[in-house]
Amino acid sequence: MQDEQDKYLKNIDFYEILSLVSKYVSNPDTVNLLSNQKILKTKESLEKIFSFVSLIRMLFESCKGYPNSFINSLKYPISLLLKENSRVSIENLRDIIVFLDEVLRINLFLHKNSDIKHLNVQILSDLLFLNPELKNLLNELKEHIDVDALELKSGVVKEYDSIEFEIKNLNRRVENQIKKIISLNAEYLTSNFVCYKSNKYTLALKSNFKGKIKGNIISISSSGETFYIEPNDIVNANNRLNYLSLEKERIILKILRNLSAKVHSNIVLLDNLYNNFLYYDSLKARAIYGIKTKGVFPEISNVLNIFDAHHPLLKDSKAITFTPAENRVVIITGPNAGGKTVTLKTIGLLSAMFQFGIPIVVGESSTFKIFDNIFIDIGDEQSISNSLSTFSSHMSNISYILKHTTKDSLVIFDEFCSGTDIDQGQALAISILEYLININSYVLISTHYNALKYFAYTHEGVVNASMRMDLETMQPNYNLIFSIPGESYAFNVASKALIDRSIVIRANEIYSSQKTEINEILEKLIEKEKDLLLIKESMDKKLIQIELQEKELENFYQDLLLREKNIETKLLNEQNEFLKNSRKVLENLVREIKEGNINVAKNKAFISDLEKNVDLKTNKVNSLNNKRNVVADFKIGDKVRIVNSNAKGKIVGISKKKITVNVGAFNVSVSSSEISLENFKEKKENGKNFNFSIDYNKENLLSFTIDIRGMRSVDALDFLNKKIDNIILNGINKFEIIHGKGEGHLMREVHNLLKELKFIRKYYFAHPSDGGSGKTIVEI
């Protein structure tokens, strides 16, 4: 069954896609893994692979430094080290180090980006979890092996270091000694360089001076012109070097055996991690392929609806849309070379890629169905000479499909039951189609048979679809129209191919004379379908125009709102600027009053005139503010501005009728229409906080109660001066000072201050029932 499934996938070029995905793997073993993986057939398994691939893709696209190094295959060393007393080469151990290092880098990268919202990196961390035992193994291997130089590190094994030290010193002495011999006998040598033959230092002596240098002949050149002589003076040194080299090799093998044993003790963990890495690598390759092709994962559904699909192997391919709605059988008709086969292959290939977890190039609103198998019979290889053998081959393939298809299978037939007698082929096609409808399979077919077009009109769940074609160029535009069967355009194609016009005319006459009643009915149905399609297209265009007009009106309305807002903002700024300037005038007046330079009565008259203008401006500001803050949803903690006084504060209480605003040391009760939301930074004041209550009412004067009990005289007078300034600026003409009775010291200090202020009209103690001598009433 699997071999057959592989054959069907090959027919739609699925393995070419797999080859493209394989270019992005980090390990050669991943290529084999991808080749052996099968299409997934459950929603759970698909959603799992979608989440993995999407996560890796997002990490690649949004985070810098994603680890993606090439890793050599570990299949051989792992299989060898599964056996006891096995030993691997230093190259194999180097590959294990590189692999574990890469996994460690990936883990560190995932940990670094674990706080990114909407990215569940933990599922990757769990997949590539680096066990502490493997971390220890990595550290030990790195302690012994220099990965770059591919040799053992010095300073780890004393026996190895001792041999290495002696070899280096002896090599140096031999090289110096042989260089002296060369300098004394240069005329007899074919080369002034030291030659290394059979693991020995030698000299390249000319054959006619064979006896000039005493020593052993180690080798002779192929021409016989050069003798490679080992001088007697270095024979012992050469022998010693050979011995040391053998000892070094023995020690290296011993170290490698010990390291191999340590890997063997963790081989199960290593093998599991390596297999997990290969799976991860296959996911990563899919993710990178998706980035390169801008592919997506469409929604899993019970319905196959494809929008703006592109064949991934065709350059500049045109978008294909396939929307059969609830129909499970689609009969596609149209001219040869009209795009039927490309459409069928595209749908089959994208379905296979989707179920393999490979991102596909489709519109985001597309939905794909999960099939248990994808069966394909492509009729590409048709010719006069082998039509019978081709037909027999197709029948054999269709026989297998019919035996194994289920209600969850996708069955694709190209040029369904062609290559034989038309009447018999049509009958066979209808019979097979009825069988598949009874099974309730999902079927896509292309055909030229009129009987199948008529079949679609008379059976529920079966729909015609036609490939549109440019009749001038006779080129397909891959626009699939549902409910209307297509025409073959045989006569148009013949004319385009420059067949003699008289032949084409005669063919048309013959065709017209042979029309059956069914053909005529079918043609009438097609014409009616075309008329309905034209009406639908006209209505769609009108609907689009209406939507565009609605959008234009909406944009115009939004533009008007923006203009109105800009005008309001400009006016508000002007009014606020006026209020700001008026405030400055009032501040100057207060200062002059304190200094005694202006008559209070005259000043009040001036303020009265000014207030009329202020009220006019303020009303405009209030009106605009109310307009901009309609039914403001105030809440405790909101920062607001009191529009009549320009004071800023924070809401500390809300009742049905009033809102309490804390302004500095005062609590002000106002209505919601008299405040507006404001953004400002609160100033922190040092020292003790004292509460002051203001009952704000448009119809009455503001009355302030200032409580300075418990304050030192100096602090109280300084604080009182500031608050009296604020009272004057806000146009308040009466306020109360609670100083308490006690010994009367604070009261006397307050009264002395009031005497000095020329704008104070009078002050007196409160009524005994309202505090008596503990409270002073002040009038300005």
UniProtKB/Swiss-Prot annotation:
ATP binds at residues 334-341. Pfam families: MSSS, MutS_V, Smr. InterPro entries: DNA_mismatch_repair_MutS_C, DNA_mismatch_repair_MutS_core, DNA_mismatch_repair_MutS_sf, MSSS, MutS, MutS2, P-loop_NTPase, Smr_dom. The keyword ATP-binding applies. Signal peptide: none annotated. Homodimer. Binds to stalled ribosomes, contacting rRNA. This is Endonuclease MutS2. It comes from Borreliella burgdorferi (strain ATCC 35210 / DSM 4680 / CIP 102532 / B31) (Borrelia burgdorferi). The lineage of its organism: Bacteria, Pseudomonadati, Spirochaetota, Spirochaetia, Spirochaetales.
